Amino acid sequence: MKRIIRISFTDAEATDSSSDEDTEERGGASQTRRRGKRLVKEIVIDPSDSADKLDVCKTRFKIRIPAEFLKTAKTEKKYRGVRQRPWGKWVAEIRCGRGACKGRRDRLWLGTFNTAEEAALAYDNASIKLIGPHAPTNFGLPAENQEDKTVIGASEVARGA
């Protein structure tokens, strides 16, 4: 036989109506009675849990998540500086927060791309050109045989220098 534990309590802060509706119902009286919601929660204990196995301190309640919520979870890899538009295109941008850009715009637009990897590569190239070889990137540093290792400004990155 299953055992059911009912916990009932009144939440004085929860109401179904606003305070304006309360005063209208009472004919505009200045005294308002504070109403709350009476809530009842039930916990079902399965008889298969014997009294020997059931330790109150170690009992854990399982939370069941419906499968439909698990399906909507995104499993795609996220890249730094890359986001997806609602219609499926990928965009890359460098954001400068808290004055890190020193007089530059807050957001440096890098473009729109068909895949997340293309957008991440554009971010990496611009980040290395803008910040230098120690810039945070998605794929690590490019090959060492690049002839141009100079750090350039944001306007040159935006023009595609």
Curated annotation (Swiss-Prot):
The keyword Phosphoprotein appears for this protein: no
GO cellular component, one term: nucleus
Region of interest: Disordered: 1-35
Any single GO BP term: ethylene-activated signaling pathway
Amino-acid biosynthesis is among the record's keywords: no
InterPro entries: AP2/ERF-transcript_factor, AP2/ERF_dom, AP2/ERF_dom_sf, AP2/ERF_ERF_subfamily, DNA-bd_dom_sf
Gene3D superfamilies, per the entry: AP2/ERF domain (3.30.730.10)
Keywords: Activator, DNA-binding, Ethylene signaling pathway, Nucleus, Transcription, Transcription regulation
UniProt-recorded Gene Ontology molecular function terms: DNA-binding transcription factor activity; transcription cis-regulatory region binding
Localization in the cell: Nucleus
Annotated PROSITE patterns: AP2_ERF
DNA-binding region positions on the chain: 78-140
Family annotation (Pfam families): AP2
Function: Probably acts as a transcriptional activator. Binds to the GCC-box pathogenesis-related promoter element. May be involved in the regulation of gene expression by stress factors and by components of stress signal transduction pathways.
Protein family membership: Belongs to the AP2/ERF transcription factor family. ERF subfamily.
Name of the protein this chain belongs to: Ethylene-responsive transcription factor ERF070
Species annotation: Arabidopsis thaliana
Lineage: Eukaryota, Viridiplantae, Streptophyta, Embryophyta, Tracheophyta
